[in-house]
From Swiss-Prot:
Residue ranges of domain Chitin-binding type-4 in the record: 24-201
Keywords, alphabetical: Chitin-binding, Secreted, Signal
Secretion signal span: 1-23
Source organism (scientific name): Vibrio parahaemolyticus serotype O3:K6 (strain RIMD 2210633)
Family: Belongs to the GbpA family.
Residue ranges, annotated region (Disordered): 61-80
Organism taxonomic ancestry: Bacteria, Pseudomonadati, Pseudomonadota, Gammaproteobacteria, Vibrionales
Protein name per Swiss-Prot or TrEMBL: GlcNAc-binding protein A
Domain spans labelled Chitin-binding type-3: 438-479
Length: 487
């Protein structure tokens, strides 16, 4: 049983599965990393300022999944699609303006970049690029935006990295806002992971005499008419309600997150003298339609500011339970079908899509399920090939807003067949791997016999390990480069 419970604005949790997962990873700052990626900051707030990217779309639930074609800069994602790697669930990451994304402070010189891997496949290399000194931060990211000579290259040696690792890189000198592009080239697929990192170099922040930042207004969600949002101001003794500023959401315009953020910052500046909100410029604080820092007067005795909400209509709890998904399916003569039972808590719309390892959609289903009801769903795959597959489940509320999504993994396996007589082959793959040469015949996992190709392709026949299977006969992504199928 797979259950997706909602708490507050829904945090999905699923029962663990024994099946494998696809290679995934992202640039993080959980330990010693200097800056997290744009996608990671959609899900995880910064540890020092609690800032987080907003309106990211589905990638906020899967920051590890910004995967696209490899070969950058010669090939790879198209200009304008570099930040998303042309992945649909990351499309929002391609938005590019000077004030769209949270920026992390950085200095030129030696810096630590940290990667977190949810599946640590063999690696060809990591490369780091940075935007040119004269780049345009209000134009879509393109190859012309970047210095295409990587400032840091780390050899992966075609081995599996640990689940978390760091790279020491010498960051070039820059001023102000720049974007770093970190590319992880996976060694056993034709894909790479693209992580853009928004950074701000020292020397660009204004010195604000007698003021220190104590919090910020982050437009995390839209509100409804009748709700309110307010500041919670703390001094050494605890919360001091005398400095509280509250904004009532009294019309449809204010329901939009960027609008109430601007309005609350403006109201703080009108009502308070020891607090001010907005961007500092020319000796004044100017509210913006986005994230607004909140500053405290240095001698005020105030320590920090948090944001609170009065929600007139409680956010409903949603959950979706998925029963019937097996970890493995045997491929037979009929198309493979997944027989599932979906059970909902709360009125919701469920969207299910099955993908193979190469992210080709093979089956889909969409339907509304009422609170407490169950729905029987059969997903018949358009093709059945051995290997890793994914069931992606999306939950939407009654307004059509994406609540959350989750990926469940399963495998298809070839039907057991009677192997041919042993005299017709030299080895059962991968036995005797080091002795494979041109003409060597092996019995593969699909029950068929494969023969190692002549030179110069015969060298691929011995390139195999449990974590690097691209040349494995029958199932490897590039097996036809190494082998000829004989029966």
């Amino acid at each position: 049983m797979k259950s997706f419970p909602n708490k507050s604005l829904v945090a999905l949790a699923i029962a663990s599965m024994s099946s494998g997962v696809l290679a995934h990873g992202y640039v993080s700052e959980s330990n010693d990393g200097v800056a997290a990626s744009r996608a990671a900051l959609c899900k995880y707030p910064t540890s020092d300022t609690n800032e987080r990217n907003t309106n990211c779309g589905a990638i906020q639930y899967e920051p590890q999944s910004v995967e696209g074609p490899d070969g950058f800069p010669e090939t790879g994602p198209r200009d304008g699609k570099i930040a998303s790697a042309e992945t649909a669930l990351a499309a929002a990451l391609d938005e590019q303006t000077a004030d769209r994304w949270v920026k992390r402070p950085i200095k030129s010189g030696t810096q630590t970049f940290e990667w977190t891997f949810t599946a640590n496949h063999v690696t060809r290399d990591w490369k780091y690029y940075i935007t040119k000194p004269n780049w345009n931060p209000n134009a879509s990211l393109s190859r012309d935006s970047f210095d295409l000579n990587p400032f840091c290259v780390v050899d992966g040696n075609m081995v599996q990295p640990p689940k978390q690792m760091s790279h020491q890189c010498n960051v070039p000198e820059r001023e102000g806002y720049h974007v770093i592009l970190a590319v992880w080239d996976v060694g056993d697929t034709a894909a790479s992971f693209y992580n853009v990192i928004d950074v701000k170099f020292d020397g660009d922040d204004p010195v604000i005499p007698e003021w220190t930042q104590g919090g910020q207004i982050i437009p995390t969600m839209n509100l409804k008419v009748g709700d309110s949002v307010y500041t919670r101001v703390f001094d050494q003794s605890g919360e001091n309600v005398a400095y509280r500023t509250e904004l009532a959401i009294s019309n449809d315009v204010l329901t939009q997150a960027k609008n109430w953020s601007y309005a609350l910052a403006s109201k703080i500046n009108q009502e308070q003298t020891k607090l001010q909100a907005g961007q500092y410029s020319e000796d004044k604080f100017t509210p913006v339609y986005g994230t607004n820092p909140i500053y405290l007067q240095s001698n005020s005795g105030l320590e920090r500011v948090e944001i609170g909400y009065n929600i007139e209509t409680p956010v409903p709890d949603y959950s979706l339970t998925v029963d019937g998904l097996a970890s493995e399916y045997i491929i037979g003569t009929e198309p493979t079908a997944l027989d599932l039972t979906l059970t909902a808590e709360g009125d919701l719309t469920a969207e299910l899509t099955v993908y193979n390892h190469h992210r080709e959609p093979l089956a889909s289903w969409t339907g509304s399920i009422q609170d407490g009801a169950s729905e029987q769903v059969e997903l018949t795959l358009s093709k059945s090939e051995p290997g890793h597959h994914m069931l992606v489940t999306r939950i939407k509320d009654t307004d059509g807003n994406l609540v959350d999504q989750q990926t469940l993994d399963f495998h298809l396996k070839s039907e057991e067949v009677t192997p041919p007589p042993s005299g017709e082959y030299d080895f059962v793959f991968p036995e005797g791997l080091s002795s494979y040469t041109a003409g060597t015949k092996v019995l593969a996992s699909d029950g068929a016999i494969y023969q190692c190709k002549p030179f110069p392709y015969s060298g691929y026949c011995v390139q195999w390990s449990e974590s690097a299977t691209q040349f494995e006969p029958a199932t490897g992504s590039h097996w036809e480069m190494a082998w000829d199928k004989l029966n």
